[in-house]
Every structure is written in structure tokens, then in C-alpha cells.
A protein has these predicted regions:
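Short, mixed-charge amphipathic alpha-helical segments
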Residues: 24-40, 97-107
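Conserved small/polar residues in nucleotide/adenosyl-binding loops
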Residues: 368-372, 384
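Hydrophobic or amphipathic alpha-helical targeting/insertion segments
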Residues: 85-114, 190
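Short hydrophobic alpha-helical segments enriched in small aliphatic residues
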Residues: 375-377
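Nucleic-acid processing machinery
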Residues: 1-27, 39, 46-53, 62-64, ...
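Alpha-helical scaffolds flanking conserved acidic
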Residues: 61, 76-86, 107-111, 145-146, ...
Length: 384
């Protein structure tokens, strides 16, 4: 690639990004494909086929960051990685659809087509935060992988603009994330990505609140960790006594989630009772999942008094995005309410990777097509 295409700081990021993408993507992308990608991207850069976006970001680095995020968070997928790297070259006329179809296959061409369709739709609509636009987006995309790539690309962008000098641009992107991309991530079951998008959006639009909550969480980490350990200890002993195979851990809720609770409950952080959740993940065959989840439920609720009004049973009726879990809130030590989530390892994969888990881990390529169940998901409220 021509040296002037990369600024000095960008060149410093390029090699680590390449290595990371090779490491994460090696299971799905052959070395020969990586070599061909490198050649076509280099040719595109030398021909001036890439255009920096309105933030002045290097499109090659942005595409690579999105591909890296895809592999890291959802698992590597050859066609999605190739599509995100070739999309800009196709959009700006350097690489024809026929060439992509011939050299990279129909699936890559289909994803690139979808990205072009939603980009065109995006450029023609000013009210991108409306429910109508989200439904149009899902209709035009046709393929769930297109929406997933849009979401991971936006997360890559959000990470990249932390120190951007134009605060208005940063605010615009952050607000767009909060009313379009985070709700889409939620509706596809990409909860980890949704949380990071919302945290970054809060950080950029209300840095003072973000910093205050982060500081308070850091201040109270030791006492919170000790409480979680005390809560878990008897539960763990009883689960082991019952012969269950499991992993149990505590996690602090996201900063944006805590801020929403503070606003909803009209309280400061000291008086928010569910700053963290306990997660029990059972290693169990699919046919025994529900029985063992309910057994774990009975163990926890025998030990700690439950709040029946806060039971959320997504075992009997999973969410439309595939999410399955039992959520309960119990009265723990020191008179504190504690949320406990109970699920199997299979359910945990779906909880982390959302609808992507269905087509990737089941090998069901037909499920990449957005269908009526996903349309139903698009009408769900943005928070659970």
C-alpha cells in the first residue's frame, strides 16, 4: 500500500491489527484467502479507491477493526470477514459485483449486496431512529449477517472516536448508537455488544456521569467482590452436593444500565440494590437442561428468599431472539436483593452471541435470512 495512505499513528496500528485478525480468523479463513485479501486491499489503496469517512478515519483500519470484533465477540466467519473487507471497494466502483461473485463466491456477493442496500436506505432517511426505519432496515437487509456487520462496524467506530476533536460529530454518532444500533443489538440478542455501545454512548454524551459511576464502582470493588464470594459459597457447595457440573460467577452490571436504574428509581448509586448479578452456568446435555436449571433454582431459593414478582422464566418461553434463561431476585446476606441468572452452557453461548449462534453453531445457513420472528423482535422494547 502507498505509505501516504496511512498516517504515522495508523501504521503503528496496522501490524497488530493484522496479527490479531489472522489469529482470530484462522479457523474460518484460509491463508490463501488472507493473502488475496491483502493484495486486493493494497491495490484498492494504491488506486485511491478508499475514502476517509467524515471523521477522517482510515477505512481499511475501520474494516479490519470490525472484522476483528466480529471474530472476537461472535466467532470467525469467512464470508463475513471477506465481505466487510471488500464492501468499500465495491461501493466505490473499484471491485465489481461480478468479480466478487467469481473470485469470492455467491455468499460474499450476497452480503456485500445487503450492505449496499442498507447504506443506500440509510443515506435517504433522516429519521433513522424511528421504529419505521428499523423495520425498513431489517426488510432491506434480508440477511441477518448484514445487520450484524453494521452493528460491529459501529462498535469499531465508537471505540475509534474516543479522542476525536470534533465533539459535535462524536455526539451525533453516540446519539445514533443509542436510538438505532444498541436497540438493534438488543433485538438480535447481542447483549454484550449492546452494553458496550450504550456505555460508550453515555461516556461521550455525559462524560461526568459516566466517570462518577465508574469511579464509584472502582471504589467499592473489593467489598462487592467479597459479598459475591460470600453469596456464592453455600450455593456452590449445595450444587456440588447434588452432583451438578457448573460454573458460577458474579458480574457487575454495565455503567449505562446502572445509570438507567438510578434515573428510574430516582436514587444515587449507593441505594441501587442490584449493581451486580450472579450467573450459574450448567454443563448439561440439552435434554436435561430445563430439569437441572429448575433444580438449581430450587437450591438457590431454598437458601435465599425469592421475590416472586421478579421471576423471569425464559426457559418455558424463550425470547424471540433465542435467549433462554431463568432470572430470579433473592434476598441475600446483609438484607440485599441479588439477581441470579440460571442457564446451560448452550444457552450461555446464545446469550453471548445472540441469533448469530443459531446459524454459526448449528450450521443452519438458511437461518441467516431475516424472517417473521426477527420482524417480531424488531417490535420488542429496547430493554429487557
Amino acid at each position: 500500500m502507498e505509505q501516504e495512505f496511512f498516517y504515522k499513528d495508523e501504521k503503528a496500528k496496522l501490524i497488530p491489527l493484522c496479527r490479531s485478525l489472522l489469529r482470530y480468523g484462522r479457523e474460518a479463513v484460509a491463508n490463501s484467502d488472507f493473502a488475496r485479501l491483502k493484495a486486493v486491499v493494497k491495490a484498492g489503496a494504491e488506486a485511491g479507491a478508499y475514502h476517509r469517512d467524515r471523521f477522517g478515519l482510515n477505512p481499511v483500519l475501520r474494516n479490519m477493526s470490525a472484522a476483528e470484533l466480529l471474530c472476537e465477540r461472535l466467532g470467525s466467519d469467512r464470508n463475513m470477514i471477506v465481505a466487510v473487507m471488500l464492501y468499500n471497494l465495491n461501493r466505490h466502483g473499484f471491485l465489481s459485483r461480478e468479480t466478487i461473485l467469481k473470485e469470492w463466491g455467491a455468499d460474499v456477493a450476497k452480503i456485500v449486496d445487503g450492505l449496499n442496500k442498507v447504506s443506500t436506505l440509510y443515506s435517504r432517511h433522516s429519521l433513522v431512529g424511528s421504529e419505521n426505519f428499523r423495520n425498513l432496515l431489517l426488510t432491506f437487509a434480508e440477511d441477518i449477517r448484514v445487520i450484524i456487520l453494521m452493528i460491529v462496524d459501529r462498535l469499531a467506530l465508537m471505540r475509534a472516536i474516543n479522542h476525536h476533536p470534533n465533539q459535535q460529530y462524536v455526539n451525533d454518532v453516540a446519539y445514533e448508537v443509542s436510538y438505532l444500533y444498541a436497540p438493534l443489538a438488543h433485538r438480535l440478542g447481542l447483549y454484550g455488544i449492546k452494553s458496550e455501545l450504550e456505555d460508550l454512548s453515555l461516556k461521550y454524551t455525559n462524560r461526568e456521569v459516566f466517570t462518577q459511576i465508574a469511579h464509584k464502582l472502582n471504589e467499592t470493588k473489593a467489598s462487592r467482590d467479597a459479598y459475591i464470594a460470600d453469596f456464592i459459597k453455600p450455593v456452590k457447595a449445595k450444587l456440588e452436593q447434588e452432583g451438578l457440573k457448573f460454573e458460577i460467577k458474579g458480574r457487575t452490571k454495565s455503567i449505562s444500565s446502572i445509570w438507567n436504574k438510578m434515573k428510574k428509581q430516582k436514587n444515587d448509586i449507593e441505594n441501587i440494590y442490584d449493581l451486580f448479578a450472579i450467573r450459574i452456568i450448567l454443563d448439561v446435555p440439552k435434554e436435561r437442561e430445563k430439569n437441572e436449571c429448575w433444580l438449581a433454582y430450587s437450591i438457590v431459593t431454598d437458601m435465599y428468599r425469592p421475590n416472586p414478582s421478579r421471576l423471569k422464566d425464559w426457559l418455558s418461553i424463550p425470547k424471540s431472539n433465542g435467549y433462554e434463561s431463568l432470572h430470579i431476585t433473592v434476598y441475600g446476606p446483609e438484607n440485599k436483593w441479588v439477581e441470579v441468572q440460571i442457564r446451560s452452557k448452550r444457552m450461555d453461548v446464545i446469550a453471548e452471541k445472540g441469533l448469530a449462534a443459531h446459524w454459526k453453531y448449528k450450521g443452519d445457513r438458511k437461518s441467516t435470512r431475516l424472517n417473521s420472528s426477527h420482524s417480531h423482535a424488531s417490535r420488542m422494547p429496547a430493554s429487557a
